[in-house]
Amino acid sequence: MINKPFSESCEQNKDPILSIIKQYFSEENTTVLEIGSGTGQHAAYFPYHLPHLTWLPSDTIENLQGIESWRQSTNLPNTLAPVTLDVSQTVWPVTSIDYIFSANTVHIMSWQSVESMIAGIRKILKPNGIFCLYGPFNYNGQFTSPSNAQFDLWLKSRNPESGVRDIEAIIQLAQTISDNGPLELINDHAMPANNRILVFQKQTT
């Protein structure tokens, strides 16, 4: 077993995030798909505090071993083995899901990948299902803090296709007319360190 990967930001944000998502991921016998589980820390922590549901971690293949190491260290009965998910692929490993959670992903991805992710979520999320998206966002094209502006510069220095996203663009993607029903923004929670949790609900068609 490899050493478990560790992110200090995941350690710091896990409790603030949990305080929000537990309000929405509340139904018994449901499953949460986590898109972009990264180090696996959230997938090891949240299911312990949400024993009424099953947590399904996912990420690209190079991150699965680290996620699995966290899963095995906690050995929680309601955490499934991580699955490979590349949001740019048209076929996902899940065809229907109750809830979806993703943290610190859309500012790392290219915009094309963000479009693919939102389209995939709209396809697999059940009617009235909830999607919680955590991370930094701009409002009216403006950064909400100097630190977010600096973070955006750092992201773009690593990959010009990355960057802090405009909330209006995310909402537009979520609501664009398609066969799979729109996602309506039902809440926008302020979080520590100039982050947000956007809460979307799948609308019935």
Positions of the model-derived regions?
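Conserved beta-strand signature within the Rossmann-like core of class I S-adenosyl-L-methionine
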Residues: 128-137
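Class I SAM-dependent methyltransferase Rossmann-like catalytic core
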Residues: 1-27
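A short, conserved alpha-helix within the catalytic core of class I
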Residues: 109-121
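Conserved class I S-adenosyl-L-methionine
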Residues: 28-38
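Short alpha-helix
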Residues: 161-178
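Class I SAM-dependent methyltransferase SAM/SAH-binding core
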Residues: 33, 43-90
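Core SAM-dependent methyltransferase catalytic element
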Residues: 178-181, 186-205
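A short acidic, Gly/Pro-enriched loop at the edge of an enzyme's catalytic core
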Residues: 92-100
